[in-house]
C-alpha cells in the first residue's frame, strides 16, 4: 500500500505495519539519489531538545538529492520523517521506524528586494545575510533556531512579525504527482503558527523566497518590549541591523538563542502557543483567572478570532514558575522563560512529555484554557 498519511502530526508515508527498515535496505533503495545513508542514528543528536531514539538517516545535501530521495521512499511505501534544524521537534525514546530524511541544503541568493533560500539553510544565517545586505523585514525573526524551509510550515513569528507577511512564494515537491511547483502565500492557509503545510503531508518545501525592504529599514515595530529597547514608538521603523541586535539581546535574556553550554537553551523554543480565546468566552476566562490569582491585570492582545492571551503568563500564574519543578528534575521549565521546556542534560523524551502534560493540565484545571503544543511530535502523545 502506498500513499500519504499524517500520524502524530508528522508527514509520513502510509505503509502496512511491519518491521523497521534496515540501513542496507535503504542504501539499496536510495542508490543513485545522492543521499548519504547512516543507521542507528540517535535523533537526540539532531534536535535542539536533545531527546529522541534511533533511526535510519538519509542526508540530502542538494535539492536534487532531496527530491529523488523522497520520490524513491514514497514509491516504496517507506515512512518518511523530514528533518532539518530539529528545533521544533519532539521525538520519542523509541525513535522512528522509517527513514529520517535530513534536509541539508544550504543555498542562499540575495536580490535587490528579497532573498531566496533553500529549505535546509540555517534560518538565522539567512536573516543575518539579509540584514548585512541592507534588506529589511526579517530582523524581528533573528535568533530563531531551525531551517528556512520550516518557517512557512509553522508560519514562524516573533516580536510582532510573521512569515506570512513577507513570504513571496515557496517551492514545493508535490508528493502525490512527484511534480515541483511554486506556490504563493494565498495557497498556504496561513494562521497563527500554522499553515496547510503543517497539517498535510502532501508537499515537501524545497525553497522559500521573501519580499524585503530595499532601504534597509525594519518592519514596523509592533512589540512593546522591542520598541522600548530601541527607544521607539510602536509602529515606527528603525534600521534593520539595530533591530536585529536588540532582538538577539532580548532572546538571549530569555534563553531563546541556542548555546550548547546553557541548558536553558536545550529546548524546542516556546513549547505552547499563545491561546486565542473566543470573544464570547473571554469574560468567563477573566473570572476564572481572577478567582485563582486575584484582581490582576491580564495581558491580552487582539486576534482575528478573539483575544490572545500569553501562555507564559498563564503558566506562571498557574503555579509553574521559572525552573519548575526544581534543580533535580531532568526536564524542567527554563530558569529564564516559563514557556520553554528544557532538557537539563539527562532528560529522555518521556521526561519532557510528563512535564508538558503536568503544565498543560494545571493551566486547564485552574483557568479552563487548554494550551496547545507548538512542536511537531513523533512517537509520543501529549
UniProtKB/Swiss-Prot annotation:
Chief localisation class: cytoplasm
An individual GO BP term: cell wall organization
GO molecular function: FAD binding; UDP-N-acetylmuramate dehydrogenase activity
Keywords: Cell cycle, Cell division, Cell shape, Cell wall biogenesis/degradation, Cytoplasm, FAD, Flavoprotein, NADP, Oxidoreductase, Peptidoglycan synthesis
Protein name: UDP-N-acetylenolpyruvoylglucosamine reductase
Enzyme class: oxidoreductase
Cell compartments where the protein resides: Cytoplasm
Catalytic activity line of the entry: UDP-N-acetyl-alpha-D-muramate + NADP(+) = UDP-N-acetyl-3-O-(1-carboxyvinyl)-alpha-D-glucosamine + NADPH + H(+)
Record NCBIfam families: murB, PRK13903.1
InterPro entries: FAD-bd_PCMH, FAD-bd_PCMH-like_sf, FAD-bd_PCMH_sub1, FAD-bd_PCMH_sub2, MurB, MurB_C, MurB_C_sf, Oxid_FAD_bind_N
Active site: 193, 270 (proton donor), 374
Family: Belongs to the MurB family.
Associated pathway: Cell wall biogenesis; peptidoglycan biosynthesis
Amino acid at each position: 500500500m502506498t500513499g500519504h498519511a499524517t500520524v502524530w502530526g508528522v508527514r509520513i508515508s502510509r505503509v502496512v505495519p511491519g518491521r523497521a527498515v534496515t540501513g542496507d535496505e535503504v542504501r539499496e533503495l536510495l542508490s543513485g539519489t545522492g543521499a548519504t545513508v547512516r543507521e542507528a542514528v540517535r535523533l537526540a543528536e539532531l534536535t535542539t531538545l536533545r531527546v529522541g531514539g534511533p533511526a535510519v538517516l538519509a542526508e540530502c545535501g542538494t535539492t536534487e538529492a532531496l527530491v529523488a530521495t523522497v520520490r524513491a521512499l514514497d514509491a516504496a511505501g517507506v515512512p518518511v520523517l523530514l528533518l532539518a534544524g530539529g528545533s521544533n521537534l519532539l521525538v520519542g525514546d523509541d525513535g522512528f521506524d522509517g527513514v529520517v530524511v535530513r534536509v541539508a541544503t544550504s543555498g542562499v541568493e540575495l536580490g535587490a528586494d528579497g532573498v531566496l533560500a533553500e529549505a535546509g539553510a540555517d534560518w538565522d544565517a539567512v536573516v543575518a545575510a539579509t540584514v548585512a545586505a541592507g534588506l529589511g523585514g526579517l530582523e524581528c525573526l533573528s535568533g530563531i533556531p531551525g531551517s528556512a524551509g520550516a518557517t512557512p510550515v509553522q508560519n514562524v513569528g516573533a516580536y510582532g512579525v510573521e512569515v506570512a507577511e513577507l513570504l513571496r512564494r515557496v517551492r514545493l515537491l508535490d508528493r502525490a504527482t512527484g511534480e515541483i511547483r511554486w506556490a504563493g502565500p494565498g495557497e498556504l492557509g496561513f494562521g497563527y503558527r500554522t499553515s496547510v503545510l503543517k497539517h498535510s503531508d502532501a508537499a515537501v518545501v524545497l525553497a522559500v523566497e521573501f519580499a524585503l525592504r530595499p532601504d534597509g529599514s525594519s518592519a514596523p515595530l509592533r512589540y512593546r518590549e522591542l520598541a522600548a529597547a530601541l527607544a521607539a514608538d510602536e509602529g515606527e521603523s528603525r534600521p534593520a541591523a539595530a533591530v536585529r541586535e536588540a532582538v538577539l539581546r532580548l532572546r538571549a535574556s530569555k534563553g531563546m538563542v541556542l548555546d550548547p553550554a546553557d541548558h536553558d537553551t536545550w529546548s524546542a523554543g516556546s513549547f505552547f502557543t499563545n491561546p486565542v480565546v473566543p470573544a464570547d468566552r473571554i469574560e468567563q476566562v477573566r473570572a476564572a483567572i481572577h478567582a485563582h490569582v486575584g484582581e490582576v491585570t491580564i495581558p491580552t492582545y487582539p486576534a482575528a478570532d478573539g483575544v490572545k492571551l500569553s501562555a507564559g503568563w498563564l503558566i506562571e500564574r498557574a503555579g509553574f514558575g521559572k525552573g519548575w519543578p526544581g534543580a533535580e528534575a531532568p526536564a524542567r521549565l527554563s530558569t529564564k522563560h516559563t514557556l520553554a521546556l528544557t532538557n537539563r542534560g539527562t532528560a529522555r523524551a518521556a521526561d519532557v512529555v510528563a512535564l508538558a502534560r503536568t503544565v498543560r493540565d494545571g493551566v486547564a484545571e485552574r483557568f479552563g484554557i487548554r494550551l496547545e503544543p507548538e512542536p511537531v511530535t513523533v512517537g509520543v502523545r501529549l
